[in-house]
Amino acid sequence: MEKKGLQIDWRRGLIPLSLLAMFILYFGFDAPLWVLAVFTLWIPIYYVVYPMYLRKRWTAFEKQFAYRFQKEDYKGLLELYRNQWFLRRFGPQAEMLGKLGLIYSAMGKYREAEHTFESALDRAHETQEDKLFFNLANVKYELGKYEDASQIYRSLKVNSPYRHSARTQLALIDLRQGERVDEAREFLEKARKRASAPIKERIDRALAEC
């Protein structure tokens, strides 16, 4: 998904702007040194204390998320997510939205998940896109948007860790659409043996229905 507009990290200019402000305060308004000293306190707070606090909150959230997701406590996860105001506002937005998309997907709220993953991709770094695109394609598959899902699966990088799973999904799409049915069935029957429980269930359902 192509990013729109110029992407600027405004935080890089904070220190130069602060130095300019200090220059103006000292030479323009004859501010005492103690005022300048207080003014500079934000630098260690913003660049040291704030990242440490953010990392602590994020680590705790990730552990709680993994634990509850494994327990299939999706309603509890949604409540946990909504209570994370600090992380939703100041944390890694693409990762936060990606986790919300996973919650919606697990709850069967695929339209909400689709919108959430698309929003996450708008904010994602290049290194995060593969996982988000794969999850988005899975949601589109569940919504019956097979052409969109197929296009995303095929666009994944050759060295993507999701490449094999994407091949399984493409075989499912072929089966659903009645294309290369024998080849798709053969591939899915082999893939089923080493598939995770959710994928195995998806394969079984497709084989039974098609």
Identify the function of each model-found stretch.
Residues 71, 107, 143, 177-178:
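Structural motif corresponding to the intra-repeat A-B loop/turn of tetratricopeptide repeats
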Residues 74, 110, 146, 180-181:
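TPR-repeat structural position
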